[in-house]
Each structure stands twice: as structure tokens, then as C-alpha cells.
Amino acid sequence: MRRSLAPSQRGGQRLSSRNDFTPPLLKKNKRACQQDLEQERLRQSALRDATNTSDLPLPIRFTANTEYEMAIAKVLARKFKVPIDNYVPDYGGNRTLGVRRRIVRRPLHDPLACNALVLYHAPNYTDHERMSMEPSSVLVHVVVDPLLSNILRPHQREGVRFMYECVEGKRGNFNGCIMADEMGLGKTLQCVALVWTLLKQSAECKPTINKCIIVSPSSLVKNWEKEFTKWLHGRMHCLAMEGGSKENTVRALEQFSMNASTRLGTPVLLISYETFRIYAEILCKYEVGMVICDEGHRLKNSDNLTYQALMGLKTKRRVLLSGTPIQNDLTEYFSLVNFVNPEMLGTAADFKRNFENCILRGQNADSTDKERDRALEKTQELIKLVDQCIIRRTNQILTKYLPVKFEMVICAKLTPIQLQLYTNFLKSDQVRRSLADCKEKASLTALADITTLKKLCSHPNLICEKIAAGEKGFENSQNILPINYNPKGEINPELSGKFKLLDFMLAAIRAHGNDKVVLISNYTQTLDLFELLARKRKYGFVRLDGTMSIKKRSKVVDRFNDPESDCFLFMLSSKAGGCGLNLIGANRLFMFDPDWNPANDEQAMARVWRDGQKKPCYIYRLVASGSIEEKILQRQTHKKSLSSTIIDNNESAEKHFTRDDLKDLFSFDPDILSDTHDKLKCKRCVQNVQMMPPPDDTDCTSHLSQWYHCSNNRGLPDNILAQAWTDSKCVSFVFHHRSQSQKIEATPATETSVEAKLEPERRKRPAMPLSDDSADEDFQGF
């Protein structure tokens, strides 16, 4: 109360009944609706008084039940509509507050949406059937996340569906498969879609698997993590095991293995083959939903420890990725199939007796008609079995998305110095004795001799120390080299036919355009010679071999692919970067020396013709005419023919080499144009001159016998090679073909390639390389 209104201050007077003061607390607590009622009561009282004293009309009062108010209420009661043109609500768009409805099972994604990829089609239940069924027994569609299905190409959608049907046992009594697509077709993206779908969905409205292990080469672990982040936009985290202490690794793996929750924070483990082998005891204790083995041809030997460790995993879903499931023989192929689906082909002995022996006899060029018929019968039987669990697409699919690719096998003549050193080595008594000791199986001595000859075919610099020391095979060769010969810190390209040709071609490429070049070799010593040549000609270059760290490799690749970079050459060790590396900054590639395993060369040569390439590509494979390099090329052709028969189901693959041809590694004819062409017994050529072109349906994936054959520089698709043939005078023969069905015409030296207009725009794929290893481990004897 105000002090001025207190009785002591008012002199005992009462407060006026008309004062307007209201205690603040009472005013605060008084509800607004009560105030309105009070004011309304006073107003009505005033109106009644006025009516009694005057003839004023009463005001019109509107009530809520008038027609106008009802119309307004009806408008306001309309259902909310999203103010977006052509908006289609999802399944939850009709949900409202109120009484809880009965739970209805629905697929995670709309199976009727545009580009929807439905992996499992649920039964079409009627309303009556749904009412009579238990909610837990209703099956739903399994639909790939639109985030992924909208970017998958047609062949990738087919691959995801195939793998899903295999791991779910819908294609037979098995749960494993082999994804055998060739390089560049997106095997990684297909696996990301499969894993993401299985982790989130099933026909029973719950995850199919709770965790997955992906095993890959150590250099690809980080790449897998990048792929998941790239395609899923960070929606899922992976546990990538790379480096770290043993204690931290054990703790992380135990936590991953023991966690059986269906909603893990890191449901995917990325681990290398080596790390998995070390910690297999931890990972094999508990069940795993699925295992994926990248570069699965590493499991070609069923007796090694890594294979045995992976077989110990408690999982029935196994996916193996390999663009080259047959690299050397059918025994390796059996190991891969047996890993994903044990007992599908029986035991190793059963497979050898029932399939391998018969098929190999029929593959021989001197086999009888009966043996060939028997081989064909067994081949069809094997294909029928494995077709249930293997999917194979060639990179011919890429012709729809990439520019044309020209591939050339160039036979370069040895220089007089190389020729004399090669002949002296083969005539050496010590070499003859060592070769006589190894009739059927390779010995360490024979392998060393083969490596020596391979290096000699590349450049005498690679064996100069052996020549100077007069080692086996070079006892009388010290005087063959020039007097002023200095192999250290200097290179003379004129001493090697292949280096001489390379020198001319690099100069022509540099002078006639802005093309970049990749140089690949199996030996780091050869990369040293590339580096000396680049410094001598003042070419900008970068180099990648097994000594470079993984982090630095990525920076080097990005620098080379930058169009503004001054790097002209990329020098690459085939074993260090032959897998997964993306070098689309270059469109010309030289494979300087062949590998025993055709898969290694194929992987290395696929570095430039990949997603993102916008220029026509030229692949040059250099071999020394008539030398051991041509013998290696013939073995590659034989192995690829076997793969074509079994994997690609190519029944028309001709048999061109006998076993004796393949064993005859050390024969040498210095005057031959091409030992490979002679052994092909080509029916389209007369005296090494092509009289008929290859069939129209062939390309660079076909057998060498179905390529273009050139004994001169007329008709070549590349003006750079045509000019170098004339200038270097060291080319004896060329096989060439293209990737697309386009007419090949000779290109004048003043013109650019006709294919330069092809500029498709596709995804850029990050990649990582493998470790360096230049051993001839794939040589399997004579």
C-alpha cells in the first residue's frame, strides 16, 4: 500500500471507493480473460442504461455460428499443402497426430521412384492378406539408396544386383561370388552400394549384416576409405587400420569384433592382407556379416598363410574382386572359386583330374581333334558351374564413355652392341650348362640368366658391372663396349634399340603438341635410365616407385594430372603403381619391358585410359625383336587365351603356340622381323605383308593374330610412330589395333589424330598404387 494512502496519513479518512488503484501483485495474477469479461460486463451495463434513457439502436453482434464465420473456419481447416510445384510426399507424408495407428512395414526407399534399383521384389500383398498376416511376417522391397542408384551406370547396376543375389543365396546353394570386371569399370563403387544396402536393409525390415571386413593391399586401404566418404557423403564411418602401435591395433580390432550391435558407429573394417594375417586370431573369433577381398588374385595360392587366415573367418558371405582371375593357370582359378564357395568344384585333386588336365591338353596347338572336343566339353561344363557365382565384363564397355584407344606392340631391333653381347651370352659354356640342368622346372640359375637377358634387351647400362667383372656369360665381352663408355651418371640412347626409338618418339611428342607421357618398367634401374634421359633432354618429370610414401604419391599424381603443370613425363614402377593409379593427365604410355604375368602389364597399361580421360590414348609396348622379350610376350598371349576361353567364354580362341614353342626361351634369330608373328603362322599375311585386314568385330582385346600387322610404317594410326620408324631405323614389326569400331587410316605427319574431337565427361576416380616388386615370381619354368 502506498504510504500516502495509509490511515495515519489520511487523518482517519476512508479510502474513496472510486480510486483506480489496484495492487500490482493482484493485477499481475489476474487473467487476461477475466479482464475482458469485466470490461464486457461494464459495457453491457452501460448499454442497458443508455437504452433506458434514449432511443439509440443496439449494435449488431456477430456470433461464431453465422454463415460467414463458418466459411472462414472451413478454409482454415484445409489440410496443409507443401508450396512446391509437383511435390510428391514420401511414405510419411500422411502422418498426423492422434491415435497411434497400426505399424505398417514399408521399404526404406521408394521402389517406384525414378532410377530406383530394386534388389529384392516383395510379394504384392492384398489388403485382406495384410490384415490377416502378422506384421513381422510381411516382406518389403530392398531398394538401393537413391544417392547411389542415381549415379550407377547400367553395367554397375547389373553388378550390384548380381552380387546381392549371390550373397543372399538366391542364385544357388552358395553365398559367395567373384566380381571379375576388368579395370576401370567401377568395382569399388559397386561394392560400396552393396555394403551400404546390406547394412541398412533386408526384406525383413532390418539390417542384413551388422559389420563387414574389406581386405585389400596396404596401399589401397586409404583409397577404400576415400571411396566410402566420396560416394556416401560421410553418412558412414569406416575403421581403417593403417599404422599405429600394436596395443592400439589390438584394442580397436577387439572392440570391432566383439560388438554385435546392429547399429555400429564404424560397421566397416578396412585392413590390409598383411595386417589381417597378423591379427587373424582376433578377427576369426566372432561372426562377421561379410568379407570383401580386393585384388583377390593375391589369394591364388591356397597354401599360403593369408589364404588360410581368411578361410578361418566366420562368415558365409564372401566377395572377391579381381580383374584377372586367371593369371597363370587353372589351379590359381580353382583357389579363388574355392575361397568364395568351398566345395563348389570339389577338392584340388578332383578339379585337376576332372577339368584342368583335359582343358590344357586341348589348348595345345598340336592337340588332336579328340582332345580338343574333350577340352571343349569340359570347358563348357566348368563355365556352367562357375557362371553361377562369377560376373565378368570387359573394358569394352568403356568405349561408350571414353575416347578411342590405340594399342601397339612394337618390335625394336637390337643394336650391334646388344646383338653381340646377347649372342656371346647364349654361347657361353657356363650358361649352356645351367640351361641344360633345368629341363622342366625353373632353377634359380636359370631365373638369373633370364633376368640378365631382359636387362640387356633394355640397355647395356643395366648389366655393365657384370660385363666389366667378366661374370658368367660375359667372360669375353669386356672389349665390346665403346672405349669411352661411362655408365655412371650418363646414358647413351644409341646403345639400345628400344631407348633409341623412345628418344625419337619423346622428342616428336614434345615438339608436336601438349601430350604427356607415362613411362613404365618392371625395374627401378630402368627408371634411373629414364631419369638420366629426361635430364639430358631437359624434360620435366616426376617419378613413383616403391620407395615413395603413400601420402607423397597422391601429391605427385595430382601434380602430374594438373594441366598447368610442366611435368612432361611420369616414370612409374609397374609393381609400385600398376594398380588403381589414375594418370589421366597423360594420353600416351610406354610399357618398356614385358612381365611374365599378363595381368601385371594389363593393370599398368590401364593407367591413362580411365574415367576422366578426354584425349585419344596411345599405348606402346616395346619388345626386342627375336629376343627373350618376344618369348615372354608369347607366354602372355597363351595365358590370355586360356583366360579368354574360361572367363570370357570365347570358344573361338585359336591355339597358336605349342608347348615346345613356349619352352624354347633361349633360341635367337638376329635377322627375324618378329618371332611372335612367325609363330602365329598368320594366314592374312604373305611374306610379312598384310593382305587382309582383321575381322570387323575385333579390337585391341582380341588375340594378336587378329590385330593389324605392319612390316613398314604405312597404315599406322599414329603419325608419331610412323615418323620415328623412319628416323630411328630400329623398328622391325608392329602389331596394332584400336578400342572402338572406327576406320583406321594413316595419319600424315602434319595432321593430328582424327579422334581428337572425342571429349566425354565422366567421373574422376581416386586411386592408390601397390608396393614395388620387380621379381620374376610368375615365371613357372620352361
From Swiss-Prot:
Residues of the Helicase ATP-binding domain: 168-343
SMART domains noted in UniProt: DEXDc, HELICc
Pfam family of the protein (one): Rad54_N
Spans annotated as Required for chromatin remodeling, strand pairing activities and coupling of ATPase activity: 2-9
Database matches in SUPFAM superfamilies: P-loop containing nucleoside triphosphate hydrolases
First-level EC class: hydrolase
Top-level taxon of the source organism: Eukaryota
Subcellular location: Nucleus
GO BP term (any one): DNA synthesis involved in double-strand break repair via homologous recombination
Enzyme Commission (EC) number: 3.6.4.-
Keyword DNA repair attributed: yes
Keywords for this protein: ATP-binding, Cell cycle, Cell division, DNA damage, DNA repair, DNA-binding, Helicase, Hydrolase, Meiosis, Mitosis, Nucleotide-binding, Nucleus, Phosphoprotein
GO terms for MF: ATP binding; ATP hydrolysis activity; ATP-dependent chromatin remodeler activity; DNA binding; DNA translocase activity; helicase activity
PANTHER family: DNA EXCISION REPAIR PROTEIN ERCC-6-RELATED (PTHR45629:SF7), SNF2/RAD54 FAMILY MEMBER (PTHR45629)
Record text on subunit structure and interactions: Interacts (via N-terminus) with spn-A/Rad51.
Function: Involved in mitotic DNA repair and meiotic recombination. Functions in the recombinational DNA repair pathway. Essential for interhomolog gene conversion (GC), but may have a less important role in intersister GC than spn-A/Rad51. In the presence of DNA, spn-A/Rad51 enhances the ATPase activity of okr/Rad54.
This protein's name: DNA repair and recombination protein RAD54-like
Organism: Drosophila persimilis (Fruit fly)
